[in-house]
Structure formats: structure tokens, C-alpha cells
């Protein structure tokens, strides 16, 4: 097989996206690693550091910065692969004229755990010195380059995620090894690719008292059934088990000039022994499994290389895990199964398909990556700034971790209808929270039919009602609180029970989510969030209105709007009932948490919810016009006008103690008491950002928007980025959550700065987020929020960076930068602030098409 074409073309090389040398890998992923801040009732997961995900939505393998397996994502369960034996059994090794080197810079002793087998050097071949390693992250692809005395090896991981068809959902991956003889001698080379079996892992819940979906995984020690296979020019090993239908394949195409041998079983702690080679590159002996041992399989590939010659070898990995299994015992067949009608040959057929298709995956992926980079560099702000354009490109591509990691179910019925669900994160295992998904266009971009189904679920929730009482907040989380409630009813007399025990679902409210993993299977369509009573939140309905309009404009699906219009109008009527003070802005119950920032207590009208409400009304007005509903439009316009007049009461034009000019909407104001909170809230223009991005005219005048952005930029800056809130004098606020830097908020902020002509400031925000993601080891696990300054946590010796929770979908908002540029171009060309649906519909298909 000839070497594949390099990624270099017309000023674009994937190595420019993000490449770091070996010593910097250690600095970033070990010494600079972000810790976890204890905020709330429990400390979240120190998430496995990841540079690539091999597989597909609902089933993927995490790859560590050292090229080793470190986690399995299986139908919403994050299964930690902490065993040293499992990790190092995934490391390829190369033998050049009899001398073998493991293709990782990680030393086996570095991975020791207290309960793991001690690492002795004769278990493994020597590693590559870190100075001879480089790492390129170009999500969803990865390259690791190794320089050895006589050869150079590039290990490239190629994903089907952007393949553009059914293969996107097939849990496949190909590792392409490019081996180059850099010497002046003819070399005899054997490449050995081992893999641990991930079939029938023994899983134990990591934190049984918490709400997460995280498990410790241990390799199976019984029931292994591994078989060699040879089919239609492909050769490999299928790893199975007597205890499950799951199977895993490791395979290579048969190639001229390459001798192939397979080792069906090797004990994970006996790499050098069980994978000992003969002089011809074949395995010295084949063994059978014994009880209480864990196993993997391996392939050896032996070839001769002339001086300066190279050879490219693809190795396919297939995870044939046909069933998605859940905590309540429910099972659903994965969609890919329908593409392989012969059950008995399915695993081998999957590996064969990967071997045949990977070059198309690669060319399509590089074409899309280049298109993203080119579209950024073509804008006035980035013309001539290649480094800045690459920075933004890698931030955008990084958010493709979400569909590879957080998809928890994907099914297709007999009529071809697809349903899928996505996790908020593995620590807060809620399914498609509507307030979180609102920020990201990734689902609409990649899977518009799934996005439509999800949106329909939230529209349907408006009419749903369940008066059954349930516990909320501490009483939902702690059995001690529930016990106290039952045994001491007298202590609750005269208290509001809204956040203690109240109805499960009130009619007219929008569901927060579509379920939670610890409660049952993900297709139940029941909102399980109970940290606060979101029946009375005031941001969920406006966000749904904007989301519906966005989807209709980007897909042209007017039937969706027609079918749901009456329900949407009922939802608005229900929301307006939460306007208790009659100022036109629904404020919810006093002293209650009332929006996505669920540890932030507000009073009266607040800048975030007021602008969200106006954005929702603006979306409803536009939809009424699209449906020619004159009466509905007039009614909604009246609500908008009253809300706008009340928003003006939050406007402040003054100076702080430093004499700096401040122009912004204050955090909140109570028209009844006159109480005001003058903190500066970064998120006060989120709804404006959303409406601009879907081609609607900004409802806030441009001069005012610029003034707000300048105030936020100057006031809310911190070491890590722009904090959610600061006082008018730039000091930290009281709320722990308010102190935090939100990556999504910073992406929204950067895009608004760019849109309103402040490109320099926008780039500065992106630089801060680039440091968060790539300098602190958060590639492929983007944190949602993090501490604003370096802090010293309990047990730490020096101040350092900390996040609250990682691997979140909301930062997918960074993709909207591309949409905002498109909208701005269309506005200039058409000399109109409004962009029609027909001009938006082609955007994502054109962005994601092949070369």
C-alpha cells in the first residue's frame, strides 16, 4: 500500500493546528494539569486527560497524551481504564534489526497505582525519550511522531466522525503507521500493534452517593474467547467473551512485501514474553488463556525498508458492541448493526470496512479542517494573522469531543427515524439539559434530525403535567434532610416548600432535561433535575423559543413550527404568570434560583433573564410573522414593549471608584423595593448574540452594545479569562459561582466583540481560552467553568488552576464564530440586518462537505 498523501496543501498543514514536543507534553499534561475545585456538595471528577477519541458516538476509547488507552465511553458510562497493564498493552512497539522500542514516551513505572502490579523493566520494551516525540492534535485526528536512531514513525489516528454518512456512527478507527528509514542502510523492521481486550470489563461505580455516571474498569479475567480471522484480504484477531455478545477486532489489510502474524492471546502483564518475536517477525509461541488472567491480542507486521524509503500500514480497530445497556436493565440496539446483516461475520466486516474507507475519512476530515481555517483567515480580523486563525481553528475543532464522548444512546426504528441523547457531563449526568444545549449549534450542524427530535421533546414538555410531589435541593440529595422533613413537620410550618417538596412538573413550564443516567434509560423523556425546582425558572421558555426559530431558519422546516405554534403561545402565557411584580419581565419567585446559573440567587428583574425574555419575545414575533398570525404578533409585541421599558430601569451610565466610565445593565433591580445589585454581568448580552447568529436584527442598539462590551472587558477581566460577574469596581463578587470564569461565556463575549468591531479584544479573550484548553491539559475535555485566579486547594503546596467540572457540551458555542462571520457578510452584502432562511440553510452542509 502506498503512503497516504500528507495533509500539507496551499498554506494549510494539520501540524500547524497544534503540535507540541515531548518535553512540553509533560509540562502541560503533568506539571500544568488543572486540578478540581471543591464547589458545592461534592468534588467532581479529575477527568482523564485526552488527546483523541477512537470510535464513534455512544462507543469510543479515550487516548492519553502518551498514546495509551485511558477510558472507554459506553452508552453514557465513563469507564476509567486506570490499570497500568491495560494502558501499556495499547502501546505499539517497533523492532529494528532486532532492537525493540515501545512507541510511547511514558515510562511503565510512572503509571503505578497502589493496587497495581509493580512495574519491572523486563515487562516492557524501552520507551522513546520524550525529546524524540511530538504530538499533533487536530480533532478528530491525532498524530504522534517518534524519532528513533534509524527510523521515524508517525502514528496517525483517523476517525469516521466527519465521514458524512452512516459510518459516522460506526465504532471504528484506523491507526495509520508511517515508517520511514532515515538511515543509509537496508533495515529489517517489525511493527507490533497490541491491544488489550475491552470486552466484558468489570465495572464498579466510582462515587455511588453522587449523581455521576463514572465507573472504574478492570479487564476481564475469565471467559475470554479470541479468534484469528482472515477474510477478503484482511487479517486479524477478534476478541470476544463467553459472557457477552460484545466483540473487539484488531485487523490489517494484507499487503505486498509485508509479512503478517497474529497473537490471539497475550497476558497484559507479559508483553515482552508473550509477544516475543522470531527472527522473521512472527510470534515465538501462541498461548491459550488461563483463569484469573487478563488478555489482549496483537498483530506483527514485518517488512524491509531500503535507505530513505517509507512504508504506510493501516491498522483497524472495531468495537462491535451491539447493545446499549442501562441501569434499569433496558437495552437498545446500536444503529450500526443494521448495516451488517450477517451477525456471525459482523465484527470482521466492520474491520474490513474501516480498512477500505479510512482514506476517505481522512481526506474529508482535512478538507473540513482546512475550510474552517480558510473561512477564519478570510475575515478582515484574521487576514495576515495565521497564528490567530490557527488558534481559533483548534478551539473550534476541540469541541468535536462532545459527540464522540457524551452521546449516551442512538437508535433507529424500522421507518428510519433516529433518536439520540447526550449527557450534560459525566459528573452531572442529566440528559440534554435545555439551558445548556441552547448555547451550542453542534447538534444542529452535525445531526439536524436528532436536534429536531430533541427540540420536539422540549416543546411537548410544555403541555406535560405531573402533580406528584417530589423532593428538591438538599432534600433531594441527602437522605438525612428527607428524614428530618418527615420526622419534624412542625419546623416547616409557614415556610415555602417550593424548593423542598413540590409538584414534579407543572403545566406550562419547559422541562430542564430529558432524564438522568442514574435514574433509568435515556429515552424516558422525564426531567430528573431536582437540585432546584426548575418549574419556575424563567430562562427555559425564552431559550426554547429562540432555539425553535434557529432550527426553522437553518432547516426550512415550517411544518415543525406550524404543528407546535399553539403550544408555544401557551408556553408564553404560562411564563408571563411568573411576572409577579407586573413590570413585564417574568422574575419568578423571590430569593429562588431561576435560571441556568443554579447557585446564583437574584431578586427582581435581572440583566440575564430580562434580555433572554426579550430575545424569546423577538423570536416569537418573527415566528408569528412567518405564520401570518397577526393577533398573536400584536399580543407578543405588547409583551416585548413592556419588557423593553422595564429593562431600561436596569441601565446604568456612570463611573466607578476608579473614575472609569461604566455603561451596562446592572445585575438586578427590584421595582417594588428599589433594591439594586450593581455588579457587572458578562452574560447580559447572550440573547443578543443568539439572535444575531440566526440572522435577526439586534434589539439593542449597536452603540449601547459596544458600550456594554467595553465595560465588561475592562471590569470583569481575571487571570483565567472574563469572570461571570464582578463588582462595578472590578472586585470579586460574593457568589462562588459568580466568581467563576465560564468558557462558554468567554466564547460568546469574544464573538460579540468581533461582531461589533473590537477584534483585538476578541482575540485576547480567545488567547485566554486557548491557555485554559491547551496550556492546562484540557484538550478534548473542555471545562464548563473554572476558578478565575490561581488558588491553593486543600493538600496542594502552591496556587494553581482549577476547574469545577469538565467535558461539557456548552463550549460548543465556539463554532458560532463561523456562523456570525457568515451572517455579518450577508448583512453587508444585502444591506439588511435580517438574514433570510434560504441564505442560512446551505451554511452547515457547505461547511461539512467533502473536498
What are these regions, as identified by a protein language model?
Residues 94-98, 181, 340-365, 426-585, ...:
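Aromatic-rich carbohydrate-recognition surfaces in CAZymes
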Residues 3-37, 148, 153, 159-172, ...:
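Acidic/polar, glycine-enriched structural segments that form the non-catalytic walls/loops
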Residues 103, 108-110, 115-126, 140-146, ...:
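Extracellular-facing/secreted segment signature in eukaryotic proteins
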Residues 432-463, 541-543, 562, 566, ...:
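Active-site core of glycosidic bond-cleaving carbohydrate-active enzymes
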Residues 166-168, 173-176, 233, 263, ...:
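The feature captures the catalytic groove of carbohydrate-active enzymes
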Residues 379-398, 410-414, 562-566, 573, ...:
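Large, well-folded core regions of big proteins
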Residues 181-187, 195-203, 315, 319-325, ...:
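A generic secondary-structure signal for well-formed alpha-helical elements
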Residues 2-114:
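Beta-strand-rich N-terminal accessory domains
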Amino acid at each position: 500500500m502506498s503512503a497516504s498523501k500528507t495533509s500539507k496543501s496551499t498554506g494549510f498543514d494539520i501540524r500547524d493546528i497544534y503540535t507540541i514536543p515531548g518535553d512540553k507534553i509533560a509540562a502541560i499534561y503533568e506539571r500544568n494539569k488543572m486540578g478540581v475545585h471543591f464547589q458545592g456538595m461534592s468534588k467532581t471528577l479529575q477527568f482523564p486527560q485526552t488527546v483523541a477519541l477512537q470510535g464513534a458516538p455512544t462507543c469510543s476509547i479515550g487516548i492519553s497524551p502518551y498514546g495509551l488507552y485511558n477510558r472507554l465511553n459506553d452508552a453514557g458510562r465513563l469507564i476509567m481504564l486506570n490499570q497500568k497493564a491495560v494502558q501499556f498493552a495499547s502501546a505499539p512497539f517497533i523492532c529494528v534489526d532486532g532492537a525493540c522500542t515501545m512507541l510511547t514516551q511514558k515510562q511503565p513505572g510512572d503509571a503505578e497505582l497502589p493496587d497495581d502490579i509493580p512495574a519491572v523493566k523486563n515487562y516492557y520494551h524501552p520507551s522513546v525519550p520524550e525529546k524524540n516525540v511530538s504530538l499533533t492534535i487536530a480533532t478528530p485526528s491525532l498524530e504522534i511522531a517518534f524519532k528513533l536512531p534509524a527510523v521515524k514513525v508517525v502514528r496517525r489516528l483517523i476517525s469516521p466522525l466527519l465521514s458524512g454518512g452512516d459510518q459516522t456512527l460506526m465504532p471504528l478507527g484506523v491507526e495509520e503507521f508511517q515508517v520511514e528509514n532515515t538511515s543509509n542502510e537496508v533495515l529489517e523492521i517489525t511493527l507490533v500493534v497490541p491491544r488489550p481486550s475491552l470486552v466484558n470489563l468489570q465495572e464498579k461505580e466510582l462515587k455511588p452517593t453522587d449523581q455521576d455516571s463514572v465507573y472504574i474498569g478492570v479487564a476481564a479475567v475469565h471467559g475470554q474467547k479470541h479468534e484469528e480471522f482472515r477474510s477478503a484480504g484482511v487479517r486479524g484477531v477478534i476478541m470476544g467473551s463467553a459472557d457477552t455478545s460484545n466483540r473487539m477486532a484488531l485487523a490489517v489489510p494484507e499487503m505486498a512485501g509485508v509479512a503478517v502474524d497474529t497473537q490471539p492471546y497475550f497476558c497484559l502483564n507479559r508483553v515482552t514474553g508473550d509477544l516475543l518475536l522470531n527472527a522473521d517477525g512472527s510470534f515465538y509461541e501462541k498461548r491459550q488463556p488461563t483463569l484469573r488472567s487478563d488478555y489482549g491480542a496483537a498483530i506483527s507486521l514485518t517488512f524491509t525498508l531500503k535507505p530513505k524509503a517509507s512504508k504506510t500500514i493501516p491498522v483497524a480497530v472495531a468495537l462491535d458492541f451491539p447493545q446499549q445497556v442501562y441501569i434499569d436493565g433496558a437495552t437498545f440496539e446500536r444503529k450500526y448493526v443494521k448495516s451488517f446483516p450477517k451477525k456471525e461475520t459482523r465484527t470482521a466486516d466492520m474491520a474490513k470496512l474501516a480498512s477500505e474507507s479510512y482514506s476517505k475519512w481522512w481526506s474529508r476530515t482535512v478538507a473540513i479542517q482546512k475550510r474552517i481555517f480558510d473561512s477564519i483567515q478570510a475575515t478582515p480580523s484574521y487576514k495576515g494573522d495565521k497564528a490567530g486563525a490557527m488558534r481559533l481553528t483548534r478551539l473550534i475543532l476541540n469541541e468535536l469531543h462532545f459527540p464522540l464522548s457524551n452521546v449516551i444512546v442512538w437508535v433507529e426504528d424500522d421507518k428510519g427515524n433516529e433518536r439520540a441523547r447526550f449527557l450534560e457531563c459525566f459528573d452531572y449526568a442529566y440528559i440534554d439539559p435545555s439551558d445548556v444545549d441552547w448555547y451550542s449549534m453542534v447538534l444542529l450542524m452535525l445531526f439536524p434530525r436528532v436536534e429536531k427530535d430533541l427540540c420536539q421533546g422540549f416543546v411537548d414538555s410544555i403541555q406535560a403535567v405531573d402533580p406528584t410531589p417530589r423532593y428538591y435541593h438538599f432534600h433531594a440529595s441527602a437522605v438525612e434532610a428527607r428524614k428530618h422533613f418527615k420526622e419534624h413537620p412542625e419546623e416547616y410550618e409557614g415556610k415555602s416548600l417550593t424548593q423542598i417538596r413540590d409538584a414534579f412538573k407543572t403545566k406550562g413550564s419547559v422541562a430542564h432535561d430529558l432524564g438522568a443516567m442514574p435514574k433509568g434509560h435515556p429515552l424516558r423523556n422525564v426531567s430528573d433535575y431536582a437540585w432546584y425546582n426548575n418549574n419556575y425558572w424563567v430562562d427555559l421558555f425564552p431559550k426554547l423559543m429562540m432555539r425553535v426559530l434557529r432550527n426553522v431558519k437553518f432547516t426550512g422546516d415550517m411544518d415543525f413550527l406550524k404543528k407546535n405554534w399553539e403550544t408555544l403561545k401557551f408556553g408564553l402565557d404560562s411564563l408571563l404568570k411568573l411576572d409577579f411584580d407586573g413590570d413585564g419581565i417574568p422574575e419568578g419567585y423571590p430569593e429562588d434560583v431561576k435560571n441556568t446559573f443554579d447557585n446564583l440567587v437574584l431578586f427582581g428583574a435581572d440583566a440575564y433573564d430580562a434580555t433572554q425574555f426579550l430575545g424569546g419575545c423577538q423570536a416569537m414575533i418573527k415566528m408569528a410573522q412567518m405564520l401570518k398570525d397577526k393577533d398573536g404578533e400584536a399580543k407578543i409585541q405588547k409583551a416585548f414593549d413592556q419588557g423593553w421599558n422595564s429593562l431600561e430601569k436596569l441601565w446604568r451610565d456612570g463611573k466607578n471608584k476608579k473614575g472609569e466610565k461604566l455603561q451596562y445593565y446592572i445585575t438586578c433591580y427590584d421595582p417594588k423595593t428599589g433594591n439594586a445589585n450593581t455588579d457587572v454581568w458578562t452574560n447580559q448580552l447572550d440573547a443578543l448574540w443568539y439572535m444575531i447568529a440566526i440572522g435577526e436584527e439586534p434589539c439593542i442598539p449597536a452603540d449601547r452594545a459596544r458600550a456594554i462590551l467595553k465595560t465588561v472587558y475592562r471590569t470583569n477581566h481575571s487571570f483565567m479569562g472574563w469572570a461571570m460577574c464582578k463588582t462595578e469596581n472590578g472586585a470579586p463578587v460574593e457568589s462562588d459561582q459568580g466568581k467563576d470564569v465560564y468558557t462558554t461565556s468567554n466564547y460568546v463575549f469574544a464573538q460579540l466583540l468581533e461582531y461589533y468591531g473590537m477584534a483585538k479584544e476578541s482575540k485576547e479573550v480567545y488567547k485566554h481560552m486557548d491557555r485554559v484548553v491547551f496550556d492546562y491539559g484540557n484538550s478534548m475535555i473542555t471545562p464548563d467553568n473554572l476558578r478565575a485566579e490561581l488558588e491553593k486547594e486543600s493538600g496542594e503546596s502552591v496556587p494553581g488552576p482549577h476547574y469545577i467540572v469538565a467535558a461539557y457540551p456548552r463550549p460548543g458555542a465556539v463554532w458560532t464564530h463561523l456562523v456570525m462571520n457568515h451572517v455579518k457578510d450577508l448583512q453587508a452584502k444585502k444591506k439588511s440586518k435580517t438574514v433570510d432562511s434560504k441564505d442560512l440553510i446551505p451554511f452547515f452542509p457547505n461547511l461539512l462537505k467533502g473536498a
